[in-house]
């Protein structure tokens, strides 16, 4: 991902304020509510029958935290996202058979959640930088797909 020095600073400054546990669970939960077909990858998570059930599901929260932990790692390797996410790409492609479009959807949901949490601090410039990052991460995660 090519970011200007200003964009990198905007991304890392805001990310330093993110509660990964909270935002991760909320982002994954919103993905599952807004795009219900994505729930098929989470059969083992128990009750996903209503928006409240999804948003309060401890397994959704735990996996969201894990997902955002990987995203955090990616932020420290913006110049090598494909390498950083190679193993996760392989896992999601070969073993889990996740539609790579879902990575793009989750990235966009994450941007919405950040906007919700940070309000005026999440300026159009910050959003533009984050859109570049989530697009780069989605592309890296889709890299192993044939």
Curated annotation (Swiss-Prot):
MF terms (GO), sorted A to Z: haptoglobin binding; heme binding; hemoglobin alpha binding; metal ion binding; organic acid binding; oxygen binding; oxygen carrier activity; peroxidase activity
Expressing tissues: Red blood cells.
Gene Ontology BP, a term: hydrogen peroxide catabolic process
Keyword line: Acetylation, Heme, Iron, Metal-binding, Oxygen transport, Phosphoprotein, S-nitrosylation, Transport
Residues bearing PTM S-nitrosocysteine: 93
InterPro entries: Globin (IPR000971), Globin-like_sf (IPR009050), Globin/Proto (IPR012292), Hemoglobin_b (IPR002337), Hemoglobin_oxygen_transport (IPR050056)
Statement: the UniProt record of this protein carries the keyword Heme: yes
Residue(s) carrying Phosphoserine: 44
Modification Phosphothreonine occurs at: 12
N-acetylvaline, modified sites: 1
Family of this protein: Belongs to the globin family.
Subunit architecture: Heterotetramer of two alpha chains and two beta chains.
UniProt-recorded name of the protein: Hemoglobin subunit beta
